[in-house]
Amino acid sequence: LSDVKPMHCKKVLLSMDADYAGSTIRQTYITMGTMFKAAKMNDLIAKHPMDSVRFTKPVRAPDDIHFLTRDEQIRFLEVAKRSHNYNQYALILETGLRTGEMIGLTWDAIDFEKRTLTVNKTLEYRHKQHFWRAGPPKTQQSYRTIPLTDRAYEILKEIKDKRPWQKESPLLSQTLEYIDRRTGAISRLVMRDLVFINWRTGEPAKNSSYDTHLYKLCDEAEIEKFCMHALRHTYATRAIECGVQPKVLQKLLGHASIKTTMDRYVHVTSESLDQAVRQFESGRVS
């Protein structure tokens, strides 16, 4: 403990920026502060390394957020149809799921009769530790049930019908435990129940492999490279363009604040600007 310096504490918090919600980072900040305060009170350390560390909620700059124009989306999907990850990409564009929510999607979360998809867990591969980690959705509000579009329903039904011929690896015999954010109880993710399994390996595809594959597809489609989260941004943008109310979109995306929905995920496109001018023209008073 005596070797820990303020710079080490800051590094821990900064490393969480990309993968964790601001509330989770803040809770880590508080826990670290409490731990070192107790260590100092018990004479285990002479100086409190968190004294000079201040918590600042991470804010993503609008310029860092990428989304596809309608033309880019069409070109991308045409190329992606020939790839083994097409269903994953298409489903995010139809539902706005986060990558971890899509990877952790299990069949018990899909109701074909009611045509809904419930988000109640996530799954990601930790490369440094070399293991799969199940967890709760990003925030309390991220728990949600999403009505399926016709296309989303078709994608999931097609995967379900093909599943009996799916290759399976020993990894699928595992059951991962995690804490339910709403109740504090232990929940379980049965790996064999995952919707998306790589047909060649019989395992779920790792988070980073999706981005690597996306870059290749972007080159083929001759569009600017983007990462998986851009598909979620694109879903939000298309929804607003189609007239979905921001408050409704907030619920579909699982945001705690309407401000997050508007500031971070909704973009003004040239198409929507043209449409706004046409609407203004049609309502002009002569």
Report each predicted region and the residues it spans:
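Generic recognition of well-ordered alpha-helical segments
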Residues: K11, I30, T34, D150, ...
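Short, basic (Lys/Arg/His-rich) helix/loop patches that form interaction surfaces
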Residues: D19-G22, E78-S83, T95, I146, ...
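Basic, Lys/Arg- and aromatic-enriched nucleic-acid-binding interface segment
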Residues: G22, R26-T28, M41-L105, F112-E113, ...
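Catalytic-site neighborhood detector that most strongly recognizes the C-terminal catalytic loop/helix
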Residues: V59, F67, L123, T234, ...
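N-terminal core-binding DNA-recognition domain of tyrosine site-specific recombinases/integrases
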Residues: L1-L44, G202-Y210, E224-A230
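Proline-centered turn/helix-capping motifs that create local helix->coil transitions or kinks
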Residues: K40-P49, F112-R115, K121-K128, D161-S187
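C-terminal secondary-structure termini that scaffold catalytic or DNA-interacting sites
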Residues: K114, Y125-Y143, P147-A152, E158, ...
